[in-house]
From Swiss-Prot:
Any Pfam family: Iso_dh
Subunit structure: Homodimer.
InterPro entries the record matches: IsoCit/isopropylmalate_DH_CS (IPR019818), Isocitrate_DH_NADP_dimer_prok (IPR004439), IsoPropMal-DH-like_dom (IPR024084)
Cofactor(s) this protein requires: Mg(2+); Mn(2+)
Gene this chain is encoded by: icd
Record-level GO cellular component terms: extracellular region
Name of the molecule in the record: Isocitrate dehydrogenase [NADP]
Length: 418
């Protein structure tokens, strides 16, 4: 495929998807990356250096990533034209090369695209936002036992109120929808019908089941003990409540789960280990308490878009903040790994910020590719650098006797501890 601005590496091969949706990964895979806006200029080169070092150490030159820069955000407006924030060829390349990674992207000012991150997820149907949350020993935390937190969140990415189906108060569209609801549907629960913004919350059986299926399969593949469906079904019975019901259906129909003590909780035997996997549900507001009071009781979380946003950031705060929180957006075939924090433009180009989020997202990427030896080295390097208290400013200011490192120096410290 020919591209207008993207330079395809001269050496390197594509990752391909097999019929069973497993990956066929060559020894020199081409990986598209989006540098990112703001601090993307600092963290992306460090991530690439750390990943290359881990791959070299793990495979002694037998494997090597061929990095291919693709463009989105402010850099795309410089490379293409000022109105092109998300070029079609970037979407094509990410889809075509299967596995990619991105830095943080800014939200364009003005109309058109509300969020580049949401646009990428929707246009590539990356319906799972996967966020593992764990504590690295030595990372400053506001809670007493951050080590009890070891969860993986599966957040539905394509539906819920994030679908963006809403209309401004006073607009003809909002008034038309409100009129239809009150006059045609007999709705009497809208307290103020004038000057009222209105939105739609789509939650489908198909969208729910494919998300929960991914979470259950992850629990099986990674020897996890439970999957918790987090919802607000006590209030929103036909959307969030349906999410819970459809989730249990997947566990029963596709994984052979049976009622536990009369239900509604269920359990099934992991076919790979023989251990029981418990499938349970928790109301979203109670879950925000539980992650503080009893985090050790939770393992894999499957939830809708808005709940997942709240939960993943709240959990990240318990283990040291979003500076080191990794994430991935997945479809059945395409995987895009990402820094989960913002662009922090005031720090851009200062070689100051923590590159941990993007580096640990790259660790997830390597594991996804089956390159577990290299992924393990990144975890080892991260643990080593933090244990030695050689850290960036966000950790250094909260740790006694720590050595302050720049962004690039922190990457070098990780490499040294591999």
């Amino acid at each position: 495929m020919g591209y207008q601005k993207i330079q395809v590496p001269a050496t390197g091969d594509k990752i391909t998807v097999n019929a069973d949706m497993s990956l066929s990964v060559p020894k020199n895979p081409i990986i598209p990356f989006i540098e990112g806006d703001g601090i993307g200029v600092d963290i992306s080169p460090v991530m690439i250096k750390v990943v290359d070092a881990a791959v070299e150490k793990a495979y002694k030159g037998e494997r090597k990533i061929a990095w291919m820069e693709v463009y989105a955000g402010e850099k795309a407006t410089q490379v293409y034209d000022q109105d092109t924030w998300l070029p079609q060829e970037t979407l094509d390349a990410v889809r075509d090369y299967v596995v990619s990674i991105k830095g943080p992207l800014t939200t364009p000012v003005g109309g058109g695209i509300r969020s580049l991150n949401v646009a990428l997820r929707q246009q590539l149907d990356l319906y799972v936002c996967q966020r593992p949350v764990r504590w690295f020993e030595g990372v400053p935390s506001p809670v007493k036992k951050p080590g009890d937190v070891d969860m993986v969140i599966f957040r539905e990415n394509s539906e819920d109120i994030y679908a963006g189906v809403e209309w401004k108060a006073g607009s003809p569209e909002a008034e038309k929808v409100i009129k239809f609801l009150t006059e045609e549907m007999g709705v009497k629960k809208i307290r103020f019908t004038e000057n009222c913004g209105i939105g739609i919350k789509p939650v489908s059986q198909e969208g729910t089941k494919r998300l929960v299926r991914k979470a259950l399969q992850y629990a099986v593949d990674n020897d996890r003990s439970s999957v918790t469906l987090v919802h607000k079904g006590n209030i929103m019975k036909f959307t969030e409540g349906a999410f819970k019901d459809w989730g249990y259906e997947v566990a029963r129909d596709e994984f052979g789960a049976e009622l536990l003590d009369g239900g509604p909780w269920m359990q099934f035997k992991n076919p790979k280990t023989g251990k029981n996997v418990v499938v349970k549900d928790v109301i979203a507001d109670a879950m925000l308490q539980q992650i503080l009071l009893r985090p050790a009781e939770y393992d894999v979380i499957a939830t809708l878009n808005l709940n997942g946003d709240y939960l993943s950031d709240a959990l990240a705060a318990e283990v040291g903040g979003i500076g080191i929180a990794p994430g991935a957006n997945l479809s059945d075939s395409v995987a895009m790994f990402e820094a989960t924090h913002g662009t922090a433009p005031k720090y851009a180009g200062q070689d100051k910020v923590n590159p941990g989020s993007l580096i640990l997202s790259a660790e997830m990427m390597l594991r996804h590719m089956g390159w577990t030896e290299a992924a393990d080295l990144i975890i080892k390097g991260t643990n080593g650098a933090i244990a030695a208290k050689t850290v960036t400013y966000d950790f250094e200011r909260l740790m006694d006797g720590a050595t302050l490192l720049s962004c690039s120096e922190f990457g070098d410290a990780m490499i040294a501890k591999m």
